[in-house]
Protein backbone atom coordinates (compact mmCIF):
# COMPACT_ATOMS: atom_id res chain seq x y z
CA UNK A 1 0.00 0.00 0.00
CA UNK A 2 1.31 3.48 -0.84
CA UNK A 3 0.49 5.42 2.33
CA UNK A 4 0.24 9.18 2.76
CA UNK A 5 0.56 11.04 6.08
CA UNK A 6 -1.41 14.28 6.55
CA UNK A 7 -0.03 16.98 8.86
CA UNK A 8 -2.33 19.82 9.94
CA UNK A 9 -0.53 22.79 11.52
CA UNK A 10 -1.99 25.80 13.34
CA UNK A 11 -5.60 26.95 13.50
CA UNK A 12 -6.03 27.26 9.74
CA UNK A 13 -4.40 23.91 8.95
CA UNK A 14 -6.41 22.09 11.62
CA UNK A 15 -9.74 23.51 10.52
CA UNK A 16 -9.08 22.74 6.84
CA UNK A 17 -7.87 19.27 7.84
CA UNK A 18 -11.02 18.64 9.85
CA UNK A 19 -13.17 19.61 6.85
CA UNK A 20 -11.11 17.25 4.64
CA UNK A 21 -11.53 14.27 6.96
CA UNK A 22 -15.27 15.01 7.17
CA UNK A 23 -15.39 14.64 3.37
CA UNK A 24 -13.13 11.57 3.23
CA UNK A 25 -15.48 9.79 5.66
CA UNK A 26 -18.40 10.36 3.27
CA UNK A 27 -16.37 9.26 0.26
CA UNK A 28 -15.14 6.04 1.86
CA UNK A 29 -18.34 5.13 3.71
CA UNK A 30 -16.91 5.51 7.23
CA UNK A 31 -18.83 6.60 10.34
CA UNK A 32 -17.74 9.41 12.67
CA UNK A 33 -16.29 6.86 15.09
CA UNK A 34 -14.18 5.19 12.39
CA UNK A 35 -16.38 2.12 11.88
CA UNK A 36 -17.33 1.16 8.32
CA UNK A 37 -20.93 1.83 7.34
CA UNK A 38 -23.12 -1.19 6.61
CA UNK A 39 -24.43 -1.64 3.07
CA UNK A 40 -27.91 -0.61 4.30
CA UNK A 41 -26.54 2.63 5.80
CA UNK A 42 -24.66 3.40 2.60
CA UNK A 43 -27.70 2.82 0.43
CA UNK A 44 -29.84 4.99 2.72
CA UNK A 45 -27.32 7.84 2.61
CA UNK A 46 -26.88 7.50 -1.17
CA UNK A 47 -23.10 7.34 -0.75
CA UNK A 48 -20.97 6.52 -3.79
CA UNK A 49 -19.01 4.14 -1.53
CA UNK A 50 -22.05 1.79 -1.52
CA UNK A 51 -20.84 0.37 -4.83
CA UNK A 52 -18.08 -2.11 -4.01
CA UNK A 53 -17.92 -1.54 -0.27
CA UNK A 54 -14.87 -3.77 0.25
CA UNK A 55 -12.97 -1.94 -2.47
CA UNK A 56 -13.80 1.37 -0.81
CA UNK A 57 -12.37 0.16 2.52
CA UNK A 58 -9.22 -0.99 0.70
CA UNK A 59 -8.89 2.33 -1.10
CA UNK A 60 -9.13 4.16 2.22
CA UNK A 61 -5.91 2.56 3.44
CA UNK A 62 -3.77 5.19 1.71
CA UNK A 63 -5.08 7.74 4.21
CA UNK A 64 -6.45 5.54 7.03
CA UNK A 65 -4.90 2.88 9.27
CA UNK A 66 -7.11 -0.10 10.06
CA UNK A 67 -7.09 -1.38 13.65
CA UNK A 68 -7.59 -5.00 14.71
CA UNK A 69 -11.35 -4.53 15.17
CA UNK A 70 -11.78 -2.97 11.71
CA UNK A 71 -11.89 0.66 12.85
CA UNK A 72 -10.41 3.22 10.43
CA UNK A 73 -8.06 5.78 12.01
CA UNK A 74 -6.80 8.79 9.99
CA UNK A 75 -3.07 8.64 9.28
CA UNK A 76 -2.79 12.21 10.40
CA UNK A 77 -1.25 14.57 12.96
CA UNK A 78 -2.79 17.80 14.25
CA UNK A 79 -0.36 20.32 15.79
CA UNK A 80 -0.89 23.71 17.39
CA UNK A 81 1.24 25.64 19.83
CA UNK A 82 -1.78 26.55 21.96
CA UNK A 83 -4.53 24.18 23.10
CA UNK A 84 -7.81 25.93 22.13
CA UNK A 85 -8.22 24.67 18.55
CA UNK A 86 -6.95 21.17 19.33
CA UNK A 87 -9.39 21.03 22.28
CA UNK A 88 -12.21 21.81 19.83
CA UNK A 89 -11.13 18.76 17.81
CA UNK A 90 -10.81 16.64 20.98
CA UNK A 91 -14.38 17.53 21.92
CA UNK A 92 -15.87 17.80 18.42
CA UNK A 93 -18.10 15.38 16.53
CA UNK A 94 -15.09 13.42 15.20
CA UNK A 95 -13.39 12.99 18.59
CA UNK A 96 -13.67 9.19 18.43
CA UNK A 97 -12.12 9.11 14.97
CA UNK A 98 -8.67 10.53 15.70
CA UNK A 99 -5.93 8.83 17.69
CA UNK A 100 -5.58 10.94 20.89
CA UNK A 101 -1.77 10.89 20.70
CA UNK A 102 -1.93 12.40 17.22
CA UNK A 103 -3.53 15.60 18.56
CA UNK A 104 -0.53 17.56 19.82
CA UNK A 105 -0.78 20.99 21.46
CA UNK A 106 1.60 23.25 23.35
CA UNK A 107 0.78 25.65 26.17
CA UNK A 108 1.59 29.00 24.60
CA UNK A 109 0.40 30.78 21.46
CA UNK A 110 2.81 31.78 18.67
CA UNK A 111 1.07 35.19 18.65
CA UNK A 112 1.24 35.62 14.84
CA UNK A 113 5.02 35.64 15.14
CA UNK A 114 7.06 33.46 12.77
CA UNK A 115 10.06 33.60 15.12
CA UNK A 116 8.03 32.24 18.06
CA UNK A 117 6.73 29.37 15.94
CA UNK A 118 10.18 28.50 14.65
CA UNK A 119 12.75 29.46 17.28
CA UNK A 120 11.27 29.69 20.76
CA UNK A 121 7.85 28.09 21.40
CA UNK A 122 8.05 25.71 18.40
CA UNK A 123 11.28 24.13 19.67
CA UNK A 124 9.39 22.83 22.74
CA UNK A 125 6.91 20.82 20.63
CA UNK A 126 8.96 19.69 17.62
CA UNK A 127 10.41 16.53 19.19
CA UNK A 128 6.95 15.26 20.21
CA UNK A 129 5.75 15.78 16.65
CA UNK A 130 8.72 14.11 14.94
CA UNK A 131 8.67 11.08 17.27
CA UNK A 132 4.94 10.61 16.61
CA UNK A 133 5.54 10.93 12.86
CA UNK A 134 8.28 8.32 13.12
CA UNK A 135 5.83 5.94 14.80
CA UNK A 136 3.28 6.48 12.02
CA UNK A 137 5.94 6.08 9.30
CA UNK A 138 7.14 2.80 10.83
CA UNK A 139 3.62 1.38 10.59
CA UNK A 140 3.50 2.07 6.83
CA UNK A 141 4.36 -0.60 4.25
CA UNK A 142 5.54 1.94 1.69
CA UNK A 143 5.24 5.59 2.72
CA UNK A 144 4.62 7.81 -0.31
CA UNK A 145 4.97 11.17 1.34
CA UNK A 146 3.38 13.95 3.36
CA UNK A 147 0.53 16.39 2.80
CA UNK A 148 0.95 19.51 4.94
CA UNK A 149 -1.91 21.95 5.61
CA UNK A 150 -1.16 25.37 7.07
CA UNK A 151 -1.50 29.11 6.60
CA UNK A 152 1.45 31.33 5.82
CA UNK A 153 0.17 34.30 7.80
CA UNK A 154 -0.11 32.87 11.33
CA UNK A 155 2.77 32.28 13.73
CA UNK A 156 2.39 28.49 14.01
CA UNK A 157 1.39 27.96 10.38
CA UNK A 158 4.46 29.87 9.21
CA UNK A 159 7.21 29.39 11.80
CA UNK A 160 6.48 25.89 13.07
CA UNK A 161 5.81 24.61 9.54
CA UNK A 162 9.22 25.77 8.33
CA UNK A 163 10.89 24.09 11.33
CA UNK A 164 9.02 20.82 10.72
CA UNK A 165 9.52 20.79 6.94
CA UNK A 166 13.28 21.15 7.46
CA UNK A 167 13.20 18.17 9.84
CA UNK A 168 11.15 16.15 7.35
CA UNK A 169 13.60 16.80 4.53
CA UNK A 170 16.42 15.54 6.78
CA UNK A 171 14.58 12.46 8.12
CA UNK A 172 12.58 11.58 4.97
CA UNK A 173 14.67 13.13 2.20
CA UNK A 174 13.38 10.79 -0.53
CA UNK A 175 9.70 11.23 0.38
CA UNK A 176 7.44 13.70 -1.35
CA UNK A 177 6.30 16.77 0.62
CA UNK A 178 3.22 18.55 -0.74
CA UNK A 179 1.90 21.71 0.90
CA UNK A 180 -1.59 23.19 0.84
CA UNK A 181 -0.82 26.72 1.99
CA UNK A 182 -3.32 29.52 2.63
CA UNK A 183 -1.67 32.69 1.41
CA UNK A 184 -2.35 36.16 2.83
CA UNK A 185 -4.72 37.80 0.39
CA UNK A 186 -4.58 41.38 -0.86
CA UNK A 187 -7.72 42.50 1.04
CA UNK A 188 -8.63 39.87 3.65
CA UNK A 189 -6.11 40.09 6.47
CA UNK A 190 -6.08 38.65 9.99
CA UNK A 191 -2.75 40.07 11.19
CA UNK A 192 -0.61 43.11 10.36
CA UNK A 193 2.59 41.05 10.18
CA UNK A 194 1.25 38.48 7.68
CA UNK A 195 3.61 39.66 4.88
CA UNK A 196 6.62 39.07 7.16
CA UNK A 197 5.47 35.59 8.16
CA UNK A 198 4.56 34.54 4.62
CA UNK A 199 7.80 35.75 3.07
CA UNK A 200 9.97 34.21 5.79
CA UNK A 201 8.23 30.82 5.43
CA UNK A 202 8.38 30.81 1.64
CA UNK A 203 12.10 31.56 1.92
CA UNK A 204 12.90 28.95 4.57
CA UNK A 205 10.89 26.13 2.93
CA UNK A 206 11.96 26.93 -0.67
CA UNK A 207 14.56 24.15 -0.78
CA UNK A 208 12.58 21.68 1.34
CA UNK A 209 9.01 21.62 -0.04
CA UNK A 210 8.50 19.77 -3.30
CA UNK A 211 5.23 21.37 -4.32
CA UNK A 212 3.12 24.14 -2.73
CA UNK A 213 -0.54 24.44 -3.76
CA UNK A 214 -1.52 27.98 -2.90
CA UNK A 215 -4.96 29.10 -1.76
CA UNK A 216 -5.84 32.71 -1.08
CA UNK A 217 -8.63 33.64 1.33
CA UNK A 218 -9.91 36.47 -0.85
CA UNK A 219 -10.35 34.21 -3.88
CA UNK A 220 -12.23 31.67 -1.72
CA UNK A 221 -14.43 34.45 -0.23
CA UNK A 222 -15.30 35.67 -3.73
CA UNK A 223 -16.19 32.16 -4.90
CA UNK A 224 -18.50 31.73 -1.88
CA UNK A 225 -20.07 35.14 -2.52
CA UNK A 226 -20.39 35.17 -6.29
CA UNK A 227 -20.61 31.53 -7.34
CA UNK A 228 -22.17 29.81 -4.34
CA UNK A 229 -24.49 32.59 -3.20
CA UNK A 230 -23.22 32.67 0.42
CA UNK A 231 -23.65 36.29 1.54
CA UNK A 232 -21.37 36.29 4.57
CA UNK A 233 -19.06 33.29 4.34
CA UNK A 234 -17.74 31.93 7.63
CA UNK A 235 -14.49 29.96 7.92
CA UNK A 236 -16.60 26.82 7.87
CA UNK A 237 -17.81 27.69 4.34
CA UNK A 238 -14.28 28.47 3.16
CA UNK A 239 -12.81 25.31 4.68
CA UNK A 240 -15.43 23.06 3.13
CA UNK A 241 -14.73 24.54 -0.28
CA UNK A 242 -10.97 24.05 0.18
CA UNK A 243 -11.68 20.47 1.38
CA UNK A 244 -13.54 19.75 -1.87
CA UNK A 245 -10.48 20.85 -3.84
CA UNK A 246 -8.11 18.81 -1.66
CA UNK A 247 -10.42 15.82 -2.07
CA UNK A 248 -10.32 16.12 -5.88
CA UNK A 249 -6.55 16.46 -5.83
CA UNK A 250 -6.10 13.41 -3.60
CA UNK A 251 -8.90 11.26 -5.11
CA UNK A 252 -6.44 9.53 -7.40
CA UNK A 253 -4.34 8.56 -4.37
CA UNK A 254 -7.35 7.19 -2.50
CA UNK A 255 -9.32 5.39 -5.22
CA UNK A 256 -8.30 3.02 -7.96
CA UNK A 257 -9.08 4.57 -11.35
CA UNK A 258 -8.26 4.24 -15.01
CA UNK A 259 -5.71 7.05 -15.21
CA UNK A 260 -4.48 7.63 -11.71
CA UNK A 261 -1.94 10.16 -10.52
CA UNK A 262 0.63 9.19 -7.89
CA UNK A 263 1.92 11.67 -5.26
CA UNK A 264 5.33 11.86 -6.97
CA UNK A 265 3.67 12.39 -10.34
CA UNK A 266 2.33 15.77 -9.22
CA UNK A 267 5.89 16.91 -8.75
CA UNK A 268 7.22 15.27 -11.91
CA UNK A 269 4.50 16.77 -14.11
CA UNK A 270 4.07 20.17 -12.51
CA UNK A 271 7.53 21.30 -11.42
CA UNK A 272 9.84 22.01 -14.38
CA UNK A 273 12.52 23.61 -12.15
CA UNK A 274 12.99 22.97 -8.41
CA UNK A 275 12.21 26.56 -7.31
CA UNK A 276 9.17 27.00 -9.57
CA UNK A 277 6.98 24.74 -7.44
CA UNK A 278 3.86 26.83 -6.77
CA UNK A 279 1.02 25.40 -8.88
CA UNK A 280 -2.26 27.27 -9.20
CA UNK A 281 -5.41 25.30 -8.37
CA UNK A 282 -8.80 25.69 -10.09
CA UNK A 283 -12.04 23.72 -9.64
CA UNK A 284 -15.30 23.29 -11.53
CA UNK A 285 -18.26 23.27 -11.23
CA UNK A 286 -18.49 25.97 -8.56
CA UNK A 287 -22.19 26.65 -8.21
CA UNK A 288 -25.07 26.46 -5.77
CA UNK A 289 -27.80 23.82 -5.96
CA UNK A 290 -30.34 26.37 -7.32
CA UNK A 291 -28.12 27.24 -10.30
CA UNK A 292 -26.97 23.69 -10.89
CA UNK A 293 -30.49 22.49 -11.65
CA UNK A 294 -30.45 24.63 -14.81
CA UNK A 295 -26.92 23.83 -15.94
CA UNK A 296 -25.45 21.05 -18.00
CA UNK A 297 -22.08 19.95 -16.63
CA UNK A 298 -20.50 18.82 -19.88
CA UNK A 299 -16.80 17.94 -19.84
CA UNK A 300 -16.00 20.83 -22.20
CA UNK A 301 -17.85 23.29 -19.94
CA UNK A 302 -15.98 22.08 -16.84
CA UNK A 303 -12.61 22.17 -18.62
CA UNK A 304 -13.17 25.71 -19.93
CA UNK A 305 -14.38 26.87 -16.48
CA UNK A 306 -11.07 25.76 -14.94
CA UNK A 307 -9.27 28.35 -17.08
CA UNK A 308 -11.50 31.20 -15.83
CA UNK A 309 -9.98 33.42 -13.14
CA UNK A 310 -13.26 33.20 -11.13
CA UNK A 311 -12.57 29.47 -10.57
CA UNK A 312 -8.97 29.95 -9.43
CA UNK A 313 -7.94 29.61 -5.79
CA UNK A 314 -5.53 32.56 -5.99
CA UNK A 315 -6.45 36.06 -7.16
CA UNK A 316 -4.61 36.26 -10.48
CA UNK A 317 -5.35 36.39 -14.18
CA UNK A 318 -4.18 33.23 -15.98
CA UNK A 319 -4.31 35.11 -19.29
CA UNK A 320 -1.58 37.44 -18.06
CA UNK A 321 0.91 34.59 -17.76
CA UNK A 322 2.15 31.53 -19.59
CA UNK A 323 1.52 27.93 -18.64
CA UNK A 324 4.49 25.63 -18.08
CA UNK A 325 2.49 22.55 -17.15
CA UNK A 326 -1.11 21.61 -16.57
CA UNK A 327 -2.62 18.66 -14.77
CA UNK A 328 -6.36 18.05 -15.32
CA UNK A 329 -7.96 15.73 -12.76
CA UNK A 330 -11.45 14.56 -13.71
CA UNK A 331 -13.68 12.51 -11.45
CA UNK A 332 -17.09 10.90 -11.66
CA UNK A 333 -19.07 10.16 -14.80
CA UNK A 334 -16.28 10.92 -17.29
CA UNK A 335 -15.38 9.36 -20.67
CA UNK A 336 -11.74 9.66 -21.89
CA UNK A 337 -12.93 10.51 -25.43
CA UNK A 338 -14.76 13.63 -24.13
CA UNK A 339 -11.71 14.64 -22.10
CA UNK A 340 -9.44 14.42 -25.15
CA UNK A 341 -11.86 16.52 -27.19
CA UNK A 342 -12.08 19.17 -24.42
CA UNK A 343 -8.29 19.36 -24.00
CA UNK A 344 -7.75 19.62 -27.78
CA UNK A 345 -10.22 22.51 -27.88
CA UNK A 346 -8.33 24.27 -25.06
CA UNK A 347 -5.01 23.84 -26.87
CA UNK A 348 -6.40 25.58 -29.94
CA UNK A 349 -7.50 28.66 -27.96
CA UNK A 350 -5.33 31.68 -28.47
CA UNK A 351 -5.66 33.26 -25.02
CA UNK A 352 -4.23 30.18 -23.25
CA UNK A 353 -0.52 30.43 -23.87
CA UNK A 354 2.09 27.80 -23.11
CA UNK A 355 5.82 28.52 -22.91
CA UNK A 356 7.46 27.53 -26.17
CA UNK A 357 9.77 24.97 -24.55
CA UNK A 358 6.81 22.94 -23.27
CA UNK A 359 4.33 22.71 -26.16
CA UNK A 360 2.09 19.82 -24.99
CA UNK A 361 2.02 20.41 -21.28
CA UNK A 362 -1.14 18.45 -20.32
CA UNK A 363 -1.27 15.57 -17.85
CA UNK A 364 -4.68 13.92 -17.50
CA UNK A 365 -6.03 11.99 -14.52
CA UNK A 366 -9.43 10.26 -14.57
CA UNK A 367 -11.12 8.75 -11.56
CA UNK A 368 -14.56 7.16 -11.79
CA UNK A 369 -15.46 7.81 -8.15
CA UNK A 370 -18.15 10.52 -8.07
CA UNK A 371 -17.50 13.56 -5.86
CA UNK A 372 -19.11 13.42 -2.41
CA UNK A 373 -20.79 16.45 -0.83
CA UNK A 374 -21.34 17.38 2.79
CA UNK A 375 -25.07 17.45 3.67
CA UNK A 376 -26.35 21.06 3.77
CA UNK A 377 -23.11 22.23 2.14
CA UNK A 378 -22.88 25.17 -0.28
CA UNK A 379 -21.76 23.27 -3.38
CA UNK A 380 -24.29 21.65 -5.68
CA UNK A 381 -24.24 17.85 -5.86
CA UNK A 382 -22.93 16.92 -9.29
CA UNK A 383 -22.02 13.63 -10.93
CA UNK A 384 -18.68 14.89 -12.22
CA UNK A 385 -16.05 17.49 -11.39
CA UNK A 386 -12.73 18.74 -12.69
CA UNK A 387 -9.74 20.05 -10.77
CA UNK A 388 -6.90 21.77 -12.57
CA UNK A 389 -3.39 22.07 -11.16
CA UNK A 390 -1.31 24.33 -13.36
CA UNK A 391 2.13 25.85 -13.14
CA UNK A 392 1.79 29.30 -14.60
CA UNK A 393 3.85 32.49 -14.46
CA UNK A 394 0.61 34.36 -13.59
CA UNK A 395 0.95 33.26 -9.94
CA UNK A 396 4.02 35.48 -9.51
CA UNK A 397 1.60 38.36 -8.82
CA UNK A 398 0.94 36.76 -5.40
CA UNK A 399 4.63 37.14 -4.56
CA UNK A 400 4.92 40.69 -5.90
CA UNK A 401 1.88 41.80 -3.83
CA UNK A 402 3.44 40.24 -0.77
CA UNK A 403 6.87 41.77 -1.43
CA UNK A 404 5.32 45.22 -1.80
CA UNK A 405 3.62 44.97 1.61
CA UNK A 406 6.76 43.51 3.17
CA UNK A 407 8.83 46.44 1.86
CA UNK A 408 6.43 49.06 3.23
CA UNK A 409 6.86 47.72 6.76
CA UNK A 410 10.49 46.68 6.61
CA UNK A 411 11.65 50.11 5.37
CA UNK A 412 10.60 51.44 8.78
CA UNK A 413 11.75 48.24 10.56
CA UNK A 414 8.18 48.08 11.92
CA UNK A 415 7.49 45.14 14.29
CA UNK A 416 10.98 43.71 13.65
CA UNK A 417 11.88 43.87 17.38
CA UNK A 418 9.23 41.21 18.14
CA UNK A 419 11.02 38.77 15.86
CA UNK A 420 14.54 39.62 17.02
CA UNK A 421 13.35 39.26 20.63
CA UNK A 422 12.48 35.61 19.94
CA UNK A 423 15.98 34.70 18.82
CA UNK A 424 15.83 35.55 15.13
CA UNK A 425 18.47 37.65 13.39
CA UNK A 426 17.44 40.74 11.45
CA UNK A 427 19.56 39.56 8.53
CA UNK A 428 17.04 36.77 7.90
CA UNK A 429 14.49 39.39 6.77
CA UNK A 430 16.89 40.74 4.13
CA UNK A 431 17.86 37.23 3.06
CA UNK A 432 14.19 36.21 2.69
CA UNK A 433 13.34 39.34 0.69
CA UNK A 434 16.27 38.75 -1.69
CA UNK A 435 15.26 35.12 -2.17
CA UNK A 436 11.69 36.12 -3.12
CA UNK A 437 13.04 38.79 -5.51
CA UNK A 438 15.08 36.04 -7.20
CA UNK A 439 11.94 33.86 -7.34
CA UNK A 440 10.02 36.67 -9.09
CA UNK A 441 12.89 36.98 -11.61
CA UNK A 442 12.85 33.19 -12.10
CA UNK A 443 9.17 33.39 -13.06
CA UNK A 444 9.92 36.22 -15.50
CA UNK A 445 12.77 34.32 -17.17
CA UNK A 446 10.78 31.10 -17.41
CA UNK A 447 8.05 32.96 -19.29
CA UNK A 448 10.46 34.38 -21.87
CA UNK A 449 10.51 32.68 -25.26
CA UNK A 450 13.81 31.29 -26.51
CA UNK A 451 13.82 33.87 -29.28
CA UNK A 452 13.51 36.68 -26.73
CA UNK A 453 16.36 35.22 -24.68
CA UNK A 454 18.53 34.80 -27.72
CA UNK A 455 18.85 31.17 -26.68
CA UNK A 456 18.66 29.82 -30.25
CA UNK A 457 22.12 31.17 -31.10
CA UNK A 458 23.75 28.53 -28.89
CA UNK A 459 22.37 25.75 -31.06
CA UNK A 460 23.37 27.05 -34.50
CA UNK A 461 26.12 24.49 -34.95
CA UNK A 462 23.64 21.62 -34.65
Swiss-Prot record:
EC nos: 3.6.5.-
InterPro entries in the cross-refs: Alpha_tubulin, Tub_FtsZ_C, Tubulin, Tubulin/FtsZ-like_C, Tubulin/FtsZ_2-layer-sand-dom, Tubulin/FtsZ_GTPase_sf, Tubulin_C, Tubulin_CS
Assigned GO CC terms: cortical microtubule; cytoplasm; microtubule; nucleus; perinuclear region of cytoplasm; plasma membrane
A molecular function (GO) term: structural constituent of cytoskeleton
Binding annotation for Mg(2+): 82
Annotated function: Tubulin is the major constituent of microtubules, a cylinder consisting of laterally associated linear protofilaments composed of alpha- and beta-tubulin heterodimers. Microtubules grow by the addition of GTP-tubulin dimers to the microtubule end, where a stabilizing cap forms. Below the cap, tubulin dimers are in GDP-bound state, owing to GTPase activity of alpha-tubulin.
Family annotation (Pfam families): Tubulin, Tubulin_C
Swiss-Prot/TrEMBL cofactor(s): Mg(2+)
Taxonomy, superkingdom: Eukaryota
GO biological process: central nervous system development; embryo development ending in birth or egg hatching; embryonic cleavage; female pronucleus assembly; microtubule cytoskeleton organization; mitotic cell cycle; mitotic spindle organization; mRNA transport
Annotated family: Belongs to the tubulin family.
Subunit structure: Dimer of alpha and beta chains. A typical microtubule is a hollow water-filled tube with an outer diameter of 25 nm and an inner diameter of 15 nM. Alpha-beta heterodimers associate head-to-tail to form protofilaments running lengthwise along the microtubule wall with the beta-tubulin subunit facing the microtubule plus end conferring a structural polarity. Microtubules usually have 13 protofilaments but different protofilament numbers can be found in some organisms and specialized cells.
UniProt: GTP binding residues: 11, 82, 151, 155-156, 190, 217, 239
Major location (coarse): cytoplasm
SMART domains reported for this sequence: Tubulin (SM00864), Tubulin_C (SM00865)
Keyword hit for Cell membrane: no
Catalytic activities: GTP + H2O = GDP + phosphate + H(+)
Designated gene of the protein: alphaTub67C
Annotated active site: 265
Subcellular location: Cytoplasm, Cytoskeleton
Coiled coil: none
TM spans (from-to): none
Keywords: Cytoplasm, Cytoskeleton, GTP-binding, Hydrolase, Magnesium, Metal-binding, Microtubule, Nucleotide-binding
Protein name per UniProt: Tubulin alpha-4 chain
